[in-house]
Amino acid sequence: MLRFSFSHAFAGSYGLAPARATRFYPRILPFAARAYSADKQGDDVILRVKVAPIKRNNETLEQQRARLVYQSRKRGILETDLLLSGFAAKYLKHMTAEELNEYDELLNELDWDIYYWATKNSDASPLPEKWQHSKILRKLQAYSENKDKQILKMPDLSEF
């Protein structure tokens, strides 16, 4: 049985009835309706969407650091914001070009995945093979243990 709850939720969030929503979002809703199916009424299905990162050519190391500071601070999930912004304030200015590229790749992952990997919660989100031997992720995991027992807060921009 095909479920349309995603499109109903999408339409409802914009205050539109589902029939009217397809008129305004004709390319999104039919795709969303076909994105998954369920065997029984009430089956929960998780839909994960990952957007391909923008290729940045000719970016200097300083430009990359500035972008990574922003991306570390403005994730959209408070837990990940606090973790990554503190990590970036502590380590970003000392990273090599190779480490910056690895950190950049890590930031292209989904927010909750980064959080669960950093906190070593493999039950919620298993760590992919790609990140098994990552130096940056190991550093982030060590940082997330908060051995100094400090209260995490968003660091000032002057700390970067």
Swiss-Prot record:
Q: Where in the cell is it found?
A: Mitochondrion matrix
UniProt name for this protein = Succinate dehydrogenase assembly factor 2, mitochondrial
Predominant subcellular localization, coarse grouping: mitochondrion
Keyword hit for Secreted: no
Any GO BP: mitochondrial respiratory chain complex II assembly
UniProt cross-references to Gene3D superfamilies, sorted A to Z: Flavinator of succinate dehydrogenase (1.10.150.250)
Name the job this protein performs.
Plays an essential role in the assembly of succinate dehydrogenase (SDH), an enzyme complex (also referred to as respiratory complex II) that is a component of both the tricarboxylic acid (TCA) cycle and the mitochondrial electron transport chain, and which couples the oxidation of succinate to fumarate with the reduction of ubiquinone (coenzyme Q) to ubiquinol. Required for flavinylation (covalent attachment of FAD) of the flavoprotein subunit of the SDH catalytic dimer.
Q: Which UniProt keywords apply?
A: Chaperone, Mitochondrion
From which organism does this entry originate?
Answer: Eremothecium gossypii (strain ATCC 10895 / CBS 109.51 / FGSC 9923 / NRRL Y-1056)
Q: Pull one GO CC term from this UniProt entry.
A: mitochondrial matrix
Task: Look up the further comments and give them.
Answer: This protein may be expected to contain an N-terminal transit peptide but none has been predicted.
Identify the domain of life.
Eukaryota
Which family does the UniProt entry place this protein in?
Answer: Belongs to the SDHAF2 family.
Its assembly, as annotated, is: Interacts with the flavoprotein subunit within the SDH catalytic dimer.
Keyword Plastid annotated: no
